Amino acid sequence: MQQQQRAKSASSSMNAEGTQVGPLKATLLITNNLAAQLTLVNAVLEQGEWDNNAKPPAQIEPGATGTIIATAPLIGESGIVGDVLYKTESDGVPIVFAFRVPFGKPFPNQASIAHLPPSNLLLSVTPVEPFDPQISPVYSVSPE
């Protein structure tokens, strides 16, 4: 059941025409031992299926770069919330992460990252406290 919900969430990371949003370049700034906490994030296979047992590579370094390949904006109590698929490489092997971020302001018109100009976008990603590993990892994201 949860697997089906995960797969549905992954497939919802498309725009109205059914194509992937992006790609947008981004820099993932890892702070507060975020590399360890990223192991709690589910991975998405290249085929778009969720693999709840997959773990991101441990050697993600602060300032690691990747490509945001899709976003799925959702309206929540705290504003716009989005599922972001983040693609990077580990030893030359592509791997895609999925993590949930509250967009909200200061993004224009409460738009998601997908609506920002498709240029190099620097993101400062830090965990939202308190961190609860029992729920989907949530990170605050703001453009710089």
Spans of features found by a protein language model:
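Intrinsically disordered, low-complexity segments enriched in small/polar residues
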Residues: M1-E144
